[in-house]
């Protein structure tokens, strides 16, 4: 496809998003922006959350995992399913009972202001870093595919991307996101489905035949129990997947804000249960595509792409979609799917960051009624500017530095996990002023634990490869730290 054609495609896509914004954002109130007036259809929220769960990185990378891991990623997905059940049974009833706008308001009720601010601050850091990282990767891809050849600087690409997101989230907020997420989920699934159909046609296979082919079986092993030191060992993936979901969905304002738009806890639970089933199915589809991509590449002698001399399996999907003669239809759906995957996570991040900062730090609900909407709009602009600056900073750093920053940001979910676990599982109160210190110490200790195999290979950890299980370890260290600074008396709050 020519760059001008891709730009036209992007323009049409955003016109549709802005039209949805116009139709859903007419009310332009804080209640609609933050909670969608608690009137969102639960089934729509469930379907749209699939798109929000699959970032642009996931859209490209999950199919690429098949080469080194086969279907091992599904072990983690099964953990996700269990994690969603825990969120459904424990956290959703709690949030609805407290009637919170920001889920971190629970921490103030349970422990005090320092714990509240600590939890909200760690969410802001992790979500700003995570959203910026994902936007950076997709903006980089779009710069390479389209804008570089037109002489458009990278910073312009970034500013335009975030400006477009600001335009369609400015009025409706989460009420708009519910509908745009649905559209973006459809776009992603269409892209993957078209790719599977076209590859099967080229291979002259039916879908039923695919699962009986030896070449497919050799790329689709799911369970790995052989090597406990391996990063794809079953219990690492499965247990890690449970805690990833609890922390990065149940304790994340971005993800939970959508669940809190449902009319009541019962409907929100139905939404979460349906979404957990759909997510398993969607990940099976993505991994199936991954296996077919590598089979197709082997059969037609397509080299796996390299970037800076490094083989990049996660670039095989865009390479085949854009350059390997499967037709303009696949190229079009791939571009739309990539844009949808990127912006479905970025737009909800912008909305949730605006919500968290407005509620948790500006205390918007305590402001005069006339000042509330202007304050929210100022915060929305401010968050947009922060995202632009961080993405541009990422572009000036070396790739390894950016990756390590993103990895370190994921450690901030450990203190959230520990804080909420301590609040829900115990009746103890803490010396609230020490919470921030406990959280920072937990992050640093966890980080040093992950470095142990590299710097101290003869230690008791040896050659152990840490994976997702580092999150519950981080949470456990936080839990122990809170226990050490807890008071003897019990809280009167029913938690």
Regions found by a protein language model. Give the residues of each.
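Membrane-embedded helix-loop-helix hairpins and adjacent transmembrane boundary segments
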Residues: 1-495
